[in-house]
From Swiss-Prot:
Example of a GO biological process term: mitochondrial electron transport, cytochrome c to oxygen
Record PANTHER family: CYTOCHROME C OXIDASE SUBUNIT 5B, ISOFORM A-RELATED (PTHR10122:SF0), CYTOCHROME C OXIDASE SUBUNIT 5B, MITOCHONDRIAL (PTHR10122)
Protein name: Putative cytochrome c oxidase subunit 5b-like
MF (Gene Ontology): metal ion binding
Positions of Zn(2+) binding: 43, 67, 70
InterPro entries in alphabetical order: Cyt_c_oxidase_su5b, Cyt_c_oxidase_su5b_sf
One Pfam family named in its UniProt record: COX5B
Entry's family note: Belongs to the cytochrome c oxidase subunit 5B (TC 3.D.4.11) family.
GO cellular component: mitochondrial envelope; respiratory chain complex IV
Amino acid sequence: MIRLDKEYSGRRLLDIDHPESPFGTKESPAVVQSYFDKRNIGCRGGEGEDGHDVVWFWLDKGKSFECPVCSQYFEHGPPDGHGDDEDHHH
């Protein structure tokens, strides 16, 4: 058994958080934040019996995606505090 001291001390492995949000619908999609124009996403469906094997897909800036298994909708969005109108670099 491999001991992951960081995990036991309460820190997440590699400090990677897995975003969790309400089930995305066409009217209210799950917004996936990213600094990049394209991001790889995995959909696991809903909770419990509504879950499914992970479906991987690319989510492009300005486009939405509907999971072909559970019909959950996803939308690409900027990280908090970084709007699309902020196209300047320091």
